[in-house]
Amino acid sequence: MGLPWYRVHTVVLNDPGRLLSVHIMHTALVSGWAGSMALYELAVFDPSDPVLDPMWRQGMFVIPFMTRLGITNSWGGWSITGGTITNPGIWSYEGVAGAHIVFSGLCFLAAIWHWVYWDLEIFCDERTGKPSLDLPKIFGIHLFLSGVACFGFGAFHVTGLYGPGIWVSDPYGLTGKVQSVNPAWGAEGFDPFVPGGIASHHIAAGTLGILAGLFHLSVRPPQRLYKGLRMGNIETVLSSSIAAVFFAAFVVAGTMWYGSATTPIELFGPTRYQWDQGYFQQEIYRRVGTGLAENLSLSEAWSKIPDKLAFYDYIGNNPAKGGLFRAGSMDNGDGIAVGWLGHPIFRDKDGHELFVRRMPTFFETFPVVLVDGDGIVRADVPFRRAESKYSVEQVGVTVEFYGGELNGVSYGDPATVKKYARRAQLGEIFELDRATLKSDGVFRSSPRGWFTFGHASFALLFFFGHIWHGARTLFRDVFAGIDPDLDAQVEFGAFQKLGDPTTRRQVV
């Protein structure tokens, strides 16, 4: 046929059998990729330290999605929450991956069958004898079936009625586990951080989909609407489908980047806003304050802070710190976290407690400034030593660690104090192993960042695709030069200007 690459899909324009075939093949490719990617990630994933080397630090992309739907065990004998297991069951990570690959193979065979046997009776309009599809009826069928699936997921899988439930955690990502969730039918169900809203919204949306599907199966569209929206044209289906996909992509890009109950920080890493707002830092200080109120010493209070909470309060886990085009996992950037060194508290020679001003998200370098409790600058690492008034040496700054590996250790040497002040700019201080993976020290983004960037980018492209195909189907007559109200049978070549009966060619 000699079609250019951007026109090749016209081969399935009036061929319902092969249109079905290529969509089944597309499903085979998607499912096959998902299963294969899962097996690859399982081959490289190290489950030994779920606290300091979780899946999102290792750059896992499909494992978090399986986990949030209730998969936690591996045939390798490990659990995502730590420890070993003896009976993971069929629905382990490997089991889900295998199911996707088997399904992909079956879809592959089905696609070949439908490509070969394309001329089926079901696709033939008995009145005209030509291939055609009853698109409004197909829309009703698909709406009904997707409604059933949506309702079933919310009513059975999420609630644990027939299924594992979903991943649920506390606001600070410390106690996450898979559990059943009761639907939230009140105003709290609209809070994006309330897991109960996932169940209730799927039940409600599924019910609406079932009713809407039955409506479209039993009621035919009015003729004017049918013609006005070009409901008989397959390109209308393409345009509206693209609209549904790009809208969904924009929504999930938002829920991923800003955080929600569907994107737990234990599986996808913290959000950039938790660093910007000092979210974990405030919780850490609150816990320390509670410990001091219970007559614990400063050292004991800081020692009770979980490593997991301290690790979230580290700028290297901020997804906005990694460049969009820096390939690799977070571990390939600043290294594999080995242990928390403890919380450094700086004091000047007069005993004032000093706080290092933290680096904002979009800075690569930032001046080292130490302020007191009132926000007044008391010390810094000067840019020009000749003009310095607040240098560590002049102010006599010392540092002492509380909690962590260096608990109780103090340093007065200016070089060491400045080293830890620089590191305190980045949040809590961790020992990082950069040798194992030959990490280059340049921050990487987490799967949260990749997912958001990918879905926002493709949503924008698909938005333009929706406009393009919507315009093509709505203004098809204008582009083709044929008047839609022309009753006469137009014979191509009969007129000098297509569809204009005043320009009929003379028969010689």
From Swiss-Prot:
It is found in: Plastid, Chloroplast thylakoid membrane. It comes from the Eukaryota. Keywords: Chlorophyll, Chloroplast, Chromophore, Membrane, Photosynthesis, Photosystem II, Plastid, Thylakoid, Transmembrane, Transmembrane helix. SUPFAM superfamilies: Photosystem II antenna protein-like. The chain crosses the membrane at residues 21-36, 101-115, 140-156, 203-218, 237-252, 457-472. Its main location: plastid. One of its GO terms (molecular function) is chlorophyll binding. InterPro entries: PS_antenna-like (IPR000932), PS_II_antenna-like_sf (IPR036001), PSII_PsbB (IPR017486). Binds multiple chlorophylls. PSII binds additional chlorophylls, carotenoids and specific lipids. One of its GO terms (cellular component) is photosystem II. It is a multi-pass membrane protein. GO terms for biological process: photosynthetic electron transport in photosystem II. Belongs to the PsbB/PsbC family. PsbB subfamily. NCBIfam families: PS_II_CP47 (TIGR03039). PSII is composed of 1 copy each of membrane proteins PsbA, PsbB, PsbC, PsbD, PsbE, PsbF, PsbH, PsbI, PsbJ, PsbK, PsbL, PsbM, PsbT, PsbX, PsbY, PsbZ, Psb30/Ycf12, at least 3 peripheral proteins of the oxygen-evolving complex and a large number of cofactors. It forms dimeric complexes. One of the components of the core complex of photosystem II (PSII). It binds chlorophyll and helps catalyze the primary light-induced photochemical processes of PSII. PSII is a light-driven water:plastoquinone oxidoreductase, using light energy to abstract electrons from H(2)O, generating O(2) and a proton gradient subsequently used for ATP formation. This is Photosystem II CP47 reaction center protein. The gene is psbB.
